[in-house]
């Protein structure tokens, strides 16, 4: 029996018929138009009469030599009239469609596909297509009517399918190769203790279409233990594509290496790593338009050949391979990278590509549509704060003033006789008589058209309406700079009113009076950005940045529910900001994960797991599992100090001196590399000063984490630790005596770049000394979180402070033991760790610890090292 592959109408026409340049100057409002699409569709469909069928599912299957190809989609509307059938395609746009001479080609192609499918299935002789465009700011409608005979549609459609056939053939042939290779694939290593159960849990979760929250300590092999069962599930038809989502670049590399191991064992599996545009762009600036970038010019004319070339020759689409083939075919490497995801079996990428409301992969998740996707979410403890960040929004009053000032300069320059850079003229004569495929045009003027009275603020703004409808004609001419200045001032006045009511930080309830002028401001910006093709305004870059900020703010405003808090804040420099703070992102994250079949969320520090399950979108029906550590607990000493703390009430020179003494007592018994993690930079500097003064000198080398370390500085810092790892055994023995007193100590910030995501194996790091409990600094947002979860019936202090702090502690402690051969010390220098409220958060492997004091710690450390040296 033949198998089946399917493709949506939209994806088919967008892939096969695309051509020309990449030009981001034309599409600044495209994302917002897509987000408004559902509302626009519902609004228009409700206006139609009883003969209007909305959201009609259409599907047609074609038999090919090896497979059945199914094309499916949903017509926005089908109108059954006495003398004809009309296929209605609705599109929302921020550009003014009154000025268009014809519909957008890809939009029309989509409607023609629906017309062909419906006409064929209903044995029609001809079909009329109506393209309905809605100008989102004014809700004015414009119609294009086009008539087609079925022979015309058939000839056009057959050409479209012929162009896609080689891609369909590749998809089918590769799927057969992939599935057959999975059948013979076995786990590439001997199973570690508990690892087989871990693999089974992942597979079982995918089978039942659930989410799994998994605490997977370092060493259990979490990457292979999640990827392997996911691949096996795909082999059984439970998943069409795997997404491996991470927070860090290094983790993406590990995932790619794991797939390469499976490929070496016989797996045929194509994978792509999505790289940020700023990193992969060939040009100095990411100006995606044909005038600046040669790779943008004609990109769509060449991209499909580039894709096919790479598909036929490689299975791993790394950044290097993407850059190689993009340069060869002179196409944009970033867009090529995104397109390769269509054909990859695994997509390795940042969280953003699934969860961020602006960056998510619309080709897979657009219009709230998902698929049989498997989401493997690594280091998922990071997703909570990332989620809050992605679904929060902030606007700063001073940004409104800055843009207003720059725009006023362009208006002033207009009065000097220069060309009016801030003004665009356009005219359109509307022909109401024809009804042929040359596109008859109608404008629905029943909708309210709103134009603010800008003439009250600037005589430079000219608004003249001229048109032809029953003898009348319309000409629209508007000065965009002065319109934006007007709305910027309105927004600024509303923020000024809020500022006067604010003392430091304060919660606000109603911001509708601010949002209304903000929406009008964005509408004017949309019109301007849609009209401008070569960036006439000198402040276009500043305007674009601000445009995206207010767009995000308005989108989050629409999402706001009981999981949001609105507040204003007055800065020390008198700056003022308004924030929509997403306190609990669970619903948003759950919705995103709902776009796939199953999600596996895992981390080495996922405790307490119910806390993460609740806030990361889990439900009572979802699963959680705690993987057993494979490391020998005897090779790791855990000490807890009972006589020091980082509490604010105890901070003093005496306490800093005691902590410095603890560090010395711990490191003096064994030469090697240590890291000391402090709760803040200020605390770090005090501890370092005490240690350097009392114990610094010969045999002690101290490094300090800088407050703004770049990638080069970071690697140089880590290279000092990795030096020991490069010594072979003979050299290590030879240097044992002469380096007996050599000690390297890195003073780092808890929760910073060196406390998570670094892999220091063997003797690269033999001790982590953690000062304090990692509690976040008390601030207005943390107090908002505390109060919110208190009202939810949870322990607000735990949710806001204790749990996030403990995660930082666990991450820092996890830097020490990285392999089964590693031996090392973890010292928790805060007496609060002896309290039950903290010990309840300890992982199972921390059940055995030693309570120490400044007077006893040296002997305990010495005894531990004597057992292993």
Name each model feature, range by range:
Residues 173-215:
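Conserved pre-motif I regulatory segment
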Residues 1-83:
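Metal-dependent nuclease catalytic cores that hydrolyze phosphodiester bonds in DNA/RNA
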Residues 643-654, 708-834:
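Conserved RecA-like P-loop NTPase helicase motor core
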Residues 226, 253, 329-346, 351-415, ...:
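Signature of the SF2 helicase/ATPase Hel1-core->accessory helical subdomain module
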Residues 179, 238-347, 352-355, 412-419, ...:
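A substrate-engagement module of RecA-like helicase motors
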Residues 60-154:
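Mg2+/Mn2+-dependent nuclease catalytic core
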Residues 322-347, 357-365, 521, 527-645, ...:
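A contiguous, basic/glycine-rich beta-loop/short-helix subdomain that forms a polymer-engagement track
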Residues 207-229:
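Walker A/P-loop
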